Amino acid sequence: GGHMNAAGVHCVTFLLMAKECGVEVDEHTLQSSLLQFYRFAGRGNVAYGDGLPEGGMVDNGRTTGLAFAMQAAANLHPDGEQSVYAKARDISATKGFYSTSWLFHGHTGGGIGELWRGQSMGLVQDKRPDAYHSFMDGRRWMYELARTHEGIFGWVSTWNVSYTETATERRGWGNRIPLIYTLPRKQLRMFGAPP
């Protein structure tokens, strides 16, 4: 057996959010998986597999996924925004945001990394407003082109992240693009809305 942390980090987020909603969650599973991922915060990129944190810049969304898990953990912790999990969220979101300045860089043509990069900045926009606005101003053209005439979203590209791939056909993840705009409004609990 092995770990696939790129997917597993979202399972931790789910467990934490389920617990906050009152669902009975196995405490050992929750605590051991939270420990597994918390150890990556501030130490590089979340590893793809069962290993140490990875070096390098491009993380393809893994470290931002960790930031969302840490947001969910901070929501449960009595210290909330003063907790170690809130600090881990900010560190991970900043790392995810600054993971690369290259547009569409990474495997899958970079489309996945671009989805997470904007969302990571949305998590720390209050603490890094200048960086957030610089990012949004610099990428606005790309987000505007991502909206199709049908009202769906997908990256405009001849790579493997084009409209037909991300918006309607085999992959629907292009529809996550609007979260880059809506996340900073903090209307969902995972994005910082009050309970």
Regions found by a protein language model. Give the residues of each.
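Extended ligand-binding clefts on enzyme/binding-domain cores
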Residues: 1-115, 122-134
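Terminal, non-catalytic domain-edge segments
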Residues: 76-78, 83-94, 120-195
